[in-house]
Amino acid sequence: MKKKILFFLNIIFSIQLLSQNISFNIGSPVTEIELTGINKEKIKLSDLRGKLVLIDFWASWCKPCRRENPNKVLAYKYYNNKEFVNGNGFEIFSISLDKNSKAWNEAIKKDNLLWKNHVSDLKGWESEAAKTYNIKSIPSNILIDKN
């Protein structure tokens, strides 16, 4: 099971890195993201400092995103409390490119996305986070270390 999860995540990251112009260099600090969570609270990416974090750009209407969600749930369950050289634990910071709050919330519940860091400005492709990270397609994932 562990090998399947690692293999799948490797495929996801490889394809997405090849298909996009990432707006930062590997090893450089990432730009802060602060967006509203599903409970209307502000959540910052920097709140997760010290952990390995998967920044996940997705949307409820995106079929490939929804097909990818079960694998992210498996990875989260397996790695959430693990110790890593480059981080203490694993978290997912999900950034939705939805415009419809109800559809976004329903997708989180239906897909059983158990992590707590779900954020969106409900601006779709006009999202500041998507622009900052030069996201041109979804699903898009960026893995960052503890720093």
Task: Describe each model-derived feature in a short phrase.
Residues Q20-S46:
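N-terminal "domain-start" segment that seeds a small globular fold
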Residues N69-S94:
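Conserved helix-turn-beta segment immediately C-terminal to the redox Cys motif
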Residues L45-C62:
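Short active-site neighborhood of thiol/selenol oxidoreductases, capturing the structured segment around
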Residues F57-L74:
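Conserved redox-active cysteine motifs that mediate thiol-disulfide chemistry
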Residues M1-N25:
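Bacterial Sec-dependent N-terminal signal peptides
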Residues T36, D98, N105-K146:
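Short, internal strand/loop/helix patches
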Residues K44-L48, A130-Y133:
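Short amphipathic alpha-helix with an adjacent loop that forms part of the alpha/beta core around
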